[in-house]
Amino acid sequence: MIERRDADGIRILKLAHGKVSAMDLELGEALIAEFKDAADPSVKAVILTGTGSSFSAGVDLFRLIKDGPEYARRFVPVLDELLLATLTCPKPVVAAINGHAIAGGCILAAACDHRIMIEGNGRIGIPELVVGVPFPALPWQIIAARVADGHLRDLVFSGRSVQIDEAKAMGLIDEKCPSGMLLNRATEVAQKLASISAGAFALTKEALYSPILERVRQLADLNARVTDAWLQPHTYENIRAYLDKTIKKSEI
């Protein structure tokens, strides 16, 4: 599910959960546990990457449909906890985006301190609204902190995914990297960030991201309504319609 490797104080966490590392309850809990384990003083920085041509395809919509609202009731808080663990990890966290990073995969990458995407055909975006599900407060504020308002509205309302150059121009990623060099470059960045005083880095990171968390607290009432919407029958109708349309397109 998650492959772990340590090298010179850098912990590499590789998502290896099915073909596209779609997010479900088990992957979320496993990754949360990995971030807790990364509190070990021997770990100086974390690199998060994926397998094959996908970093992560986001929330496992087929699992949502299969297991229904009771599963969603358990999963949504875990998704929030995962993003919070990534964002607030006091150590440098580098996303080595090895391919497609869609929806929750895009947001997971955005929660990292530095984002490097491999050159190629990978796409990144947030199609949640097109799927028919609203954004919880934390994912929304993470993306809003990375992408300027005009680009943000374009991504959200269109639901489109973008390729590497447009993603960099928007702020979704920080840099691009040639094929075959992704982990080397991510390690270079992680080592550079890890060379900074750990205490100073942690305090600076806390100050940098505290406005995101404050805004989430302010949106608590709205977030409760969003969570409730994830449990409603019409949301599952929206997801089914989106999946049906997506499957039909892939068969053409």
Name every feature range the model reports, one short phrase each.
Residues 117-122, 173-221, 246-252:
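C-terminal long alpha-helix characteristic of the crotonase
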Residues 1-49, 84:
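Conserved CoA-thioester-binding segment of acyl-CoA-metabolizing enzymes
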Residues 114, 154, 158-160, 166, ...:
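Well-ordered beta-strand positions
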Residues 50-84, 130:
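Glycine- (often His-adjacent) and acidic-residue-rich active-site loop
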Residues 84-131:
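Glycine-rich beta-to-alpha active-site loop
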Residues 140-150:
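Hydrophobic, secondary-structure "cap" segments at the distal end of domains
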